[in-house]
Amino acid sequence: MKRYYFTLALIVLLLGLTIWFNVPGHPQIKIGNFERSMDLIQGLDLQGGVQVLLEADLPAETPIDPQALEDARTILENRTNALGVSENLFQVAGERRIVAEFPGLSDPEKVLAVIKETGLLEFVDLQDNPENLQEGNLILTDFGQTSTSTQPTETTTAPATEGQESLASTTVYHTIMTGKDLKSVVVSRNPNTGEVVIDFTLSDEGAKIFDEYTSNNIGKILAIVLDKKIISAPRVQGRIPSGQGQITGNFTLETANNLAIQMRYGALPIPFKVVESRVIGPTLGRDSLQKSLLAGYIGFTIVILFMGIYYRLPGVMADLSLIVYALITLTLFRFIPVTLTLPGIAGFLLSTGSALDANILIFERLKEELRAGRTFSQALDLAWKRALPSIRDSNIATLITVVILFIFGSQFGATIVKGFAFTLGVGIFVSLFCAMVVTRTFMYILVDRMKPQAKHLKWFGILD
């Protein structure tokens, strides 16, 4: 029995921690570089926000590498995180689309300015700029067609095609290097003029290329081009061996920050277009949340009363275990963290049924063993042993369904299905722990302390 008292002490400690993390004004977790706010994150349908649907801006017959789509998702997520937009969610939807959700955000333009651009940064050799190209002009470059080098090449003229009316020139200019050679990017102000500028430092390889180019092309124009648009076209004044440079232009602090983010996190491997952008109001979500919580409270209360009335003392132990289950699950939702949506709340409430289902199987088996004349200790041992296969098989079947739903939600961007499956899955694992450890510990200690006899059978739900 000593191990059950030791387990009880651990359960009490765990219960104290979960209460600590779930009371108002709960603390943050900070261990070294690891930090977690422990806030309960609400999804779009609960607090409103912005939802954006992006689609690959390529011909329908062009195949898209799934890894490129996943890389694009990661880059977009990093960009918006750098903007300070927290709790965002990016999911690949099918073979050509990405769904982005920003709970709590009311202005879509803040993120659209960053996520809709490809972010391909190029350092382009304009030589003497014979065509008098200016900032804002669209040009053609040979990046992706030939390997980059520091040697100036003869420019060629690309045949005019449909969609190139806005090009300032049909000449194809040579790309010296790209944004992948950047090591760091910082937005600052010129101390003399107050102008917003972007300071950058190149990698070792990029610094060598930059040094060689500036040494051989003093007096020439080196354009800094983003998505084929010239954003700055400085003249090389001298050799730059340090690998450090500065981008100037008509920047505001916001546009400079957006550009720096695109430079910092790299170019998208696939160009995207915004198919749909919509703002979702929080009013309906708040109303739905209040009704869902009310339904949950009512259901929770009815279940607790039923278990206590029908199963008596074992039911009370199950009720205590159910409270532990709820606190552990909510703490996990805060820690992981899980973005709670209405379907996610439904999954959580449904998993409470699994928690009670295991207890009911055990208690019914316990009643059978007691009716057969077993002692309370023997009945407890046999009840858990014989109920375990049924509990295991039913939960495995549910978990298989959860996995299928989660994969389906991930594959097709069905965040509603994915959220439901995830919260249900977490709840099932916690419910198994509570049934097989928490309730069992409570029951063994109850029997040890109470030392019940045959006259106490009614307190274990046996009325006949």
Swiss-Prot record:
Transmembrane intervals: 5-25, 293-313, 322-342, 343-363, 396-416, 419-439
Pfam families, sorted: SecD_1st, SecD_SecF_C, SecDF_P1_head
Protein's gene: secD
Low complexity bias: start-end ranges: 145-162
Known partners and oligomeric status: Forms a complex with SecF. Part of the essential Sec protein translocation apparatus which comprises SecA, SecYEG and auxiliary proteins SecDF. Other proteins may also be involved.
Record SUPFAM superfamilies: Multidrug efflux transporter AcrB transmembrane domain
Main location group: membrane
NCBIfam families (alphabetical): 2A0604s01 (TIGR00916), secD (TIGR01129)
Membrane topology: Multi-pass membrane protein
InterPro entries tied to this protein: SecD, SecD/SecF_arch_bac, SecD_1st, SecD_SecF_C, SecD_SecF_C_bact, SecDF_P1_head
Cellular component, GO, one term: plasma membrane
Molecular function terms, GO-annotated: protein-transporting ATPase activity
Record function comment: Part of the Sec protein translocase complex. Interacts with the SecYEG preprotein conducting channel. SecDF uses the proton motive force (PMF) to complete protein translocation after the ATP-dependent function of SecA.
Domain of life: Bacteria
Gene Ontology biological process: intracellular protein transmembrane transport; protein targeting; protein transport by the Sec complex
Protein name as annotated: Protein translocase subunit SecD
Organism, as annotated: Anaerolinea thermophila (strain DSM 14523 / JCM 11388 / NBRC 100420 / UNI-1)
